[in-house]
Amino acid sequence: MTTKKADYIWFNGEMVRWEDAKVHVMSHALHYGTSVFEGIRCYDSHKGPVVFRHREHMQRLHDSAKIYRFPVSQSIDELMEACRDVIRKNNLTSAYIRPLIFVGDVGMGVNPPAGYSTDVIIAAFPWGAYLGAEALEQGIDAMVSSWNRAAPNTIPTAAKAGGNYLSSLLVGSEARRHGYQEGIALDVNGYISEGAGENLFEVKDGVLFTPPFTSSALPGITRDAIIKLAKELGIEVREQVLSRESLYLADEVFMSGTAAEITPVRSVDGIQVGEGRCGPVTKRIQQAFFGLFTGETEDKWGWLDQVNQ
């Protein structure tokens, strides 16, 4: 049983009704986690519906598939057009978009047979702020998880793979069991990696800090946008290893991601961060980010892909 969120899903080149988009219970991905995916947002902007950093997301999807040696029949351009098609077909002006490449019913065994193919779906549906609309203004309470991120030579962190998110499930569910809204994972060396499903930033003395990818963090596309926007605002940005206690001593902390957008963190492990609310640097970056969709921030990078162009 599923909750219907839209009317149609793009499935291997065809528009299929939401309730008819089904896979076999013996699909390889269900047993072995053999899938890669993306999370993308379509915003209702001053230019009409726009997909944010569309090409970069589809490039990362292709890159994730390449890392795991999954064959993909569709080009990046074909997947982008499929995204636009499913948004239009569902009459959406703002949406969360979920492209997914997975290994279907190709037989049992960890290694798929020679010459196998993958299945591809793209769903688009309305979805608000991941951690709650009020969290964007008021911030959230987070905790450092007892679960570390895997070392980069065990699970490739550059790939956005379905199986990787079991780690995120452990980090996030532990936080919620203890009354927090989100968890923060450390890397195998005890330094900050990222949130359960978000990249992480700190502000100290007006400087913006974020962990490097070598700390087992996903190369976030929203993270990259924030770094570019911050530099445009004249904010110094440093990518460096960060200790757990730096979270307690930071003036501001926030999480970023397609789903989370830019969510302030008001406390970590019960210790108030800064003033315990959305800080001034975070607010400036939020305004610059959301200003892309109102026209208040110039899109110098060509990040907005118009759905109806």
UniProtKB/Swiss-Prot annotation:
Reaction catalysis annotation: L-leucine + 2-oxoglutarate = 4-methyl-2-oxopentanoate + L-glutamate; L-isoleucine + 2-oxoglutarate = (S)-3-methyl-2-oxopentanoate + L-glutamate; L-valine + 2-oxoglutarate = 3-methyl-2-oxobutanoate + L-glutamate
GO cellular component terms, alphabetically, are: cytosol
Name the Pfam families for this protein: Aminotran_4
* Entry protein name: Branched-chain-amino-acid aminotransferase
Q: Which CDD domains match?
A: BCAT_beta_family (cd01557)
InterPro entries given for it? Answer: Aminotrans_IV, Aminotrans_IV_CS, Aminotransferase-like, B_amino_transI, BCAT-like_C, BCAT-like_N, BCAT_family, Class-IV_PLP-Dep_Aminotrnsfr
Q: What class of enzyme is it?
A: transferase
One Gene Ontology term of the biological-process aspect is: L-leucine biosynthetic process
* Role this protein plays: Acts on leucine, isoleucine and valine.
Species name: Escherichia coli (strain K12)
Q: Please give the Gene Ontology molecular function terms for this protein.
A: branched-chain-amino-acid transaminase activity; identical protein binding; L-isoleucine-2-oxoglutarate transaminase activity; L-leucine-2-oxoglutarate transaminase activity; L-valine-2-oxoglutarate transaminase activity
Q: Which residues carry this modification: N6-(pyridoxal phosphate)lysine?
A: K160
The Swiss-Prot or TrEMBL record lists the needed cofactor(s) as: pyridoxal 5'-phosphate
Family, similarity comment:
Belongs to the class-IV pyridoxal-phosphate-dependent aminotransferase family.
Pathway per its UniProt entry is: Amino-acid biosynthesis; L-isoleucine biosynthesis; L-isoleucine from 2-oxobutanoate: step 4/4; Amino-acid biosynthesis; L-leucine biosynthesis; L-leucine from 3-methyl-2-oxobutanoate: step 4/4; Amino-acid biosynthesis; L-valine biosynthesis; L-valine from pyruvate: step 4/4
UniProt keyword annotations, A-Z: Amino-acid biosynthesis, Aminotransferase, Branched-chain amino acid biosynthesis, Pyridoxal phosphate, Transferase
